[in-house]
A protein has these predicted regions:
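Bacterial N-terminal signal peptides that target proteins for export
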Residues: 1-7
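Secondary-structure end/capping motifs
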Residues: 227-320
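Hydrophobic helical h-region of N-terminal Sec-dependent signal peptides
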Residues: 8-12
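Short linear loop/turn motifs
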Residues: 57, 161-163, 270-279, 324-336
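N-terminal signal peptide c-region/cleavage motif recognized by signal peptidases
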Residues: 15-17
Length: 354
């Protein structure tokens, strides 16, 4: 799906003459699909952004490396990148990026290594002398992927190789055809692969990385200082949208398709709808709940987990040291505001939505 279809959809929240809305542009590193784009669509259709005084549009840049300068220069309001490039900026010898994360969008490790079920590869160590497919060699996730392999005793570039295979279908075909021995995609893409009928085996990252956050919403430090309420309102609307999609995933999927008709599958009332709601529900389960079933605090960062992961990255040679100001990069300042809304009233709206 080309994300250009999503941009005009999310730009429909136009300020009325009676109510001026604050324009917010959010930069993504990859196009949204139904499993991660449905909450945005739900927020638009139910007027959640508008109720928070926001007119939200989305743009896509090719990876975190292209996205981050847009936020740093204030050409966009918020971004949704992985954190490794931001952390790395503290080791550049120059001024670090003037950016801070304010919302933990993926509070557990979403990346995994995927092999075909019949593959002899069962552990990370088994990837020795193998080829691993990634979307592009510029992905901001690759430092963490390399670190995971080093923790398992491998040496990327010497006895294991990353290969660019593109995303989704092209990568799936690369694995099926034997062009690569494994894929390094996120878990939702693994779900999509399974729903094509292919039996796969998933290999998790080392434990130190399992609760390390992935993508999150980030803003310029000036926005924290000059317009903190903008952050609160956006984070609240996004939290509300995830809540709606947990209650009524069918509505959220169909909202995404209505606003992105090119993404609508042929069997949108049958198997296509079932698969899409499965993808969305699985993702929300991972994002909203811990492995033990307890509910996460929306948007919150576990700074101790992050410090341990940075330490492991440093030991693996991906960072020159673990000496970074974690509490400056990742902020929980606005977390109490994100779920400050009438959940019973929103549940009623979600259940009635069609």
């Amino acid at each position: 799906m080309q994300f250009k279809y999503l941009v005009p959809m999310l730009a429909l929240a136009v300020a009325s003459p009676a109510l001026a809305l604050d324009d917010v542009t959010v930069a993504l590193a990859i196009p949204a699909a139904v499993h991660d784009g449905a909450p945005y669509a739900a927020a638009e259709e139910l007027g959640l952004f508008k109720e928070q005084g926001l007119s939200v549009s989305f743009v896509v840049f090719q990876g975190a490396g292209a996205l981050l300068p847009q936020v740093a220069s204030k050409r966009v309001t918020f971004g949704y990148p992985v954190s490794e490039p931001v952390i790395s900026s503290y080791f550049s010898g120059k001024d670090p990026l003037p950016l801070r994360y304010f919302y933990n969008g993926t509070p557990s490790q979403t990346l995994e290594y995927t092999v075909l079920e019949e593959s002899p590869i069962r552990t990370l160590a088994d990837l020795k002398d193998r080829k691993i497919g990634v979307g592009a060699l510029t992905w901001g996730t690759i430092p963490n992927s390399r670190a995971a392999l080093r923790v398992a005793g491998l040496e990327p570039g010497k006895n294991v190789e990353f290969v660019a295979v593109g995303v989704l279908g092209s990568g799936f075909q690369a694995l099926r055809s034997g062009q690569v021995d494994a894929l390094n995609y996120n878990s939702s893409w693994g779900d999509i692969f399974e729903l094509t009928g292919t039996k796969i085996r998933r290999i998790a990252y080392p434990e130190v990385f399992l609760e390390n956050p992935g993508n999150g919403f980030i803003a310029h430090e000036d926005t924290f200082r000059d317009n903190p309420d903008l952050i609160r309102r956006f984070g609240r609307a996004y939290t509300q949208a995830q809540y709606v999609c947990e209650i009524n995933p069918t509505f959220c999927v169909q909202a995404f398709w209505r606003q992105n008709p090119e993404s609508r599958p042929a069997d949108a009332e049958g198997k296509g709808l079932e698969n899409a709601t499965t993808l969305l529900t699985r993702r929300l389960q991972r994002m909203l709940y811990r492995p033990d079933g307890t509910r996460r605090q929306p948007g919150e960062y576990d700074l101790d987990v992050i410090r341990k992961a940075i330490g492991a990255m440093a030991e693996a040679g991906e960072f020159p040291s673990a000496d970074v100001p974690v509490d400056r990069i990742f902020s929980n300042e606005f977390v109490p505001a994100f779920d400050d809304f009438d959940k019973d009233a929103l549940r009623q709206r979600a259940e009635a939505a069609q």
